[in-house]
Amino acid sequence: MDNKLDVFRRELVDVEGIPLFWSIAEHWSQVESFEARPDDILISTYPKSGTTWVSEILDLIYNNGDAEKCKRDAIYKRVPFMELIIPGITNGVEMLNNMPSPRIVKTHLPVQLLPSSFWKNDCKIIYVARNAKDVVVSYYYFYQMAKIHPEPGTWEEFLEKFMAGQVSFGPWYDHVKSWWEKRKEYRILYLFYEDMKENPKCEIQKILKFLEKDIPEEILNKILYHSSFSVMKENPSANYTTMMKEEMDHSVSPFMRKGISGDWKNQFTVAQYEKFEEDYVKKMEDSTLKFRSEI
């Protein structure tokens, strides 16, 4: 493609019933055949659930809390987004293939689309889930500034699309539920964004235990500090400001917008809230998963 702008604001394309960016669908065979390595750590999330936060925490852990080492490159190069392939711009599969082990890998794929090599290699997986109402609000603003997405339309229209699962990476409801079930069979640490906001130290300790890493308190405190929202928001290697404006327009909405729980209350009308809740109960009643919508 000669014109890089041709890749933006295009409609999503279904892969096995899941709407994905057209460019991922076009290069699906490359994603599907991705070769995981046994010492890979996979960060899996539905979009806007704390992916970049956990990516930065893991990179800090792997570098013993050395924040300068973690500024060696942008977060999307340190922790490549495996399935993201945009012709002429990025290829997550190729980036990862060229990376030395141990690799930290990012994905937003629903459990049924994850390349089988992750299961075959019994890779450790950290899944982060965030309450649906905060996700949809954050996703709406992200759609506006990250132009690989189709146009979001109005808030009302986007909310309807989200409830119908007609957004990139499909329905939030199925995503969080199926990964929750999968944790019974594989090495998956399932974390909640709200718990991380409430007590980040405790959640980082869970991650360390899962990774079988023991670090001194002093380094843990460094990791806590450098992975805090206020510090990451000002860190160009963590806040995505190094991306081209054509890809992400931070003047529309910053990538790191608020980083709080309960912001949905500033966006939903009472009628939207009631409709969303009624639909939510139906979609989630078959799961033992419980979310907090504020802390």
UniProtKB/Swiss-Prot annotation:
Cystine residue pairs: none
Tissue/organ expression: Detected in kidney and liver. Detected in kidney collecting duct cells.
Keywords, in A-Z order: Catecholamine metabolism, Cytoplasm, Lipid metabolism, Transferase
GO biological process: catecholamine metabolic process; lipid metabolic process; sulfate assimilation; sulfation
Induction: Up-regulated in liver and kidney by dexamethasone, a glucocorticoid analog.
Chief localization: cytoplasm
GO cellular component: cytoplasm
Pfam families assigned: Sulfotransfer_1
Family designation: Belongs to the sulfotransferase 1 family.
Name of the protein described by the UniProt record: Sulfotransferase 1 family member D1
Protein's organism: Mus musculus (Mouse)
